[in-house]
């Protein structure tokens, strides 16, 4: 009997379910793929689905309640807190993510923020608009210290690129261990001490009860006045009011934020007009090849489904 995999279409993410299925289905004749745009569980296929593929933010209580035969959820995202908070997520259902897939685009977005802030690119753009020829020397990245909170696959990709810029790379982890391309790893309990060393403090940890609000006034106070904070992880990891105060009072040099506690960021939020804060609207994980990037992990895990080896799925998220 064929396995049934339901793929939730995501046009708002420029993700075509039809295109995804066209790439993976030829390798899995044992699987029947069905595309749905319904996210309340009322559409066809939910009751019989062995697996559901979709973006974490698409999942809702009704969807999982209707999926009586569900054995596995494959998220097209790294963060899965949108799924984990659902009461209808049954403990026996496997949940997997796209952890590690976003290294190239997340690293590049981090560098965009680091370079734009350290070179004061907003001022350069203002000068261009005003036809003002102003030349101000700025520091190079070479020799600077980047402290990365989190040492997962995306952090490892960033570390490699930082070494290419001749930067010192320090990781902060809840389980310190040697990691390639990091000069050293410090314990999360020593985050304040690590922050004091940073020219750039980059946040790359998932949102969890342990990381909620971990970047607060205390950590920001430990940073050098010349240092920058970059958050490309989850908005809830940082206290936004504390960031605004630290930048406004020039206790840190600035901040680059791609993620926020509320998305979309409300038009009246003070982050929009705080000088020294650079905002990008959740662009870090996006790329024009995102759909294609999801295929290798999806295919490896689909092989486990058809061979009834769900215990061998990769990127399993405990819940």
Please tell me what each predicted stretch does.
Residues 1-51:
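N-terminal glycine-/charge-rich "phosphate-binding" loop or analogous flexible N-terminal tail
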Residues 20, 96-109, 123, 263-319:
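C-terminal helix-to-coil terminal segments
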Residues 36-46, 61-62, 183-197:
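Short acidic low-complexity segments
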Residues 50-125:
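Phosphate/diphosphate ligand-binding glycine-rich loop within oxidoreductases
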Residues 62-69, 86-91, 220-225, 246-250, ...:
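Short, conserved loop/helix-junction motifs that constitute active-site signature segments
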Residues 124-157, 184-185:
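Glycine-rich NAD(P)-binding loop of Rossmann-like domains
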Residues 164-181:
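NAD(P)-binding Rossmann-fold cofactor-contacting core
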Residues 176-270:
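Rossmann-like adenosine-cofactor binding region
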């Amino acid at each position: 009997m064929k396995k049934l995999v339901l793929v939730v279409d995501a046009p708002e993410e420029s993700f075509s379910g039809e295109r995804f299925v066209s790439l993976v289905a030829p390798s899995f004749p044992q699987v029947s793929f069905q595309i749905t745009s319904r996210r309340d569980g009322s559409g066809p296929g939910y009751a019989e689905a062995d697996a559901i593929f979709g973006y974490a933010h698409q999942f809702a209580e009704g969807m999982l309640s209707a999926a009586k035969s569900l054995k596995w959820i494959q998220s097209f995202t790294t963060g899965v807190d949108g799924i984990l908070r659902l009461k209808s997520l049954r403990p026996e259902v496997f949940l997997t993510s796209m952890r590690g897939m976003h290294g190239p685009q997340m690293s590049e977005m981090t560098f965009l923020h680091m370079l734009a802030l350290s070179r004061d690119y907003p001022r350069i753009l203002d000068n261009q608009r005003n036809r003002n020829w102003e030349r101000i020397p700025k520091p190079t990245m070479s020799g600077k210290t980047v402290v990365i909170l989190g040492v997962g696959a995306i952090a490892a990709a960033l570390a490699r690129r930082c070494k290419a810029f001749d930067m010192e790379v320090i990781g902060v982890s809840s389980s310190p261990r040697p990691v390639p391309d990091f000069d050293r790893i410090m314990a999360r309990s020593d985050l304040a001490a690590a922050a004091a060393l940073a020219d750039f403090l980059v946040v790359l940890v998932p949102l969890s009860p342990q990381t909620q609000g971990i970047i607060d006034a205390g950590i920001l106070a430990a940073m050098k006045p010349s240092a920058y904070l970059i958050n490309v992880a989850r908005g809830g990891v940082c206290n936004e009011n504390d960031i605004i105060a630290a930048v406004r009072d020039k206790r840190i040099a600035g901040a680059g934020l791609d993620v926020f506690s509320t998305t979309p960021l409300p038009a009246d939020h003070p982050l929009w007009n705080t000088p020294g804060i650079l905002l990008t609207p959740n662009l870090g994980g996006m790329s024009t090849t995102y759909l294609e990037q999801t295929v290798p992990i999806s295919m490896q895990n689909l092989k486990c489904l058809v061979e009834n080896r769900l215990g061998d799925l990769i990127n399993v998220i405990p819940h």
